[in-house]
Amino acid sequence: MNKQDFVEITQRRYEYAMGIDSCNFDLLRSVFCDEIFMDFEDYSGKPAAKLSAEEWVESCKPLFIGLKATQHIMTNPIVEVEGNTASCQMHMQALHFFEEN
């Protein structure tokens, strides 16, 4: 992996956060290849799984549309590149603000 690989891969994580926080689901989709592996087991209790990027983006829409605001903060990226495959593992803090009634 060279420096440019690292920069481009970590840039995707910022686009991921911006896509979710702005409800720009086209931007969110553009971050991913067609098949992805997502691991939110610590959050949801569901085991990590492969799914299509479209499935992931569609599953995000009902979670974020209608919120007053969100902010996703990501740190400590660990990037690995092997041939044409890359992975990025990181910590994320997500803040979700609801409309007051």
Predicted regions and their residues:
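Long hydrophobic alpha-helices with heptad-repeat/coiled-coil character
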Residues: 12, 44-45, 100
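Short, low-complexity N-terminal intrinsically disordered segments enriched in polar/charged residues
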Residues: 1-34, 84
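Short, cysteine-centered beta-strand-loop-beta hairpins and adjacent loop/turn segments enriched
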Residues: 95-101
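A solvent-exposed, acidic/Ser-Thr-rich amphipathic alpha-helical stretch
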Residues: 25-94
